[in-house]
Amino acid sequence: RTGWLGLCALGPIMIVYPEGSFYIMVKPEDIPEIVTEHLLKGRVVTRLLYQETVTPDGIKSLNETDFYKKQHRSALRNCGVIDPENINEYIARDGYQALAKCLAEYTPEQVIQIVKDSGLRGRGGAGFPTGVKWSFAAANQADQKYVCCNADEGDPGAFMDRSILEGDPNVVIEAMAIAGYAIGATQG
């Protein structure tokens, strides 16, 4: 189980650690060879390697490839790195620390201001400022407020929401909890 790493055109993909061998276009019939040769005998199956990761000195990190080296993964930083179904792996990578900090150190109004000042925008095409949206919700007088996760892709073939929900669902839950605290939600 793992989340989305990008490079969808090369999938299915598999990374074997600790050296980070990046196998591409893996088929079910390739698995016995990977297990026997790589996992049991310690020999990389070179025919399945993403060639850009192969150097005369060995295998370079996927993060050093042309596709990744200029990227800074923020929202997707854990995708493909942690088991998305294991909360302990999320916590081990500082998961839920932002929520703990918000609850312990900031008022809801301060959280909204921090989000406004950050320039954070929604992942949809409109790019609406998140802090502004939260301030509208916080100002709304209601007996009950909700935080909802709209993860319905509007563009056919787009996997922005799917990738984060499948690869790092706890980051979404943590963000929803922070939003709930900031706007005064009672349900989510």
Specify the residue positions occupied by each region the protein language model found:
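Feature of Fe-S/electron-transfer and energy-metabolism proteins
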Residues: 1-188
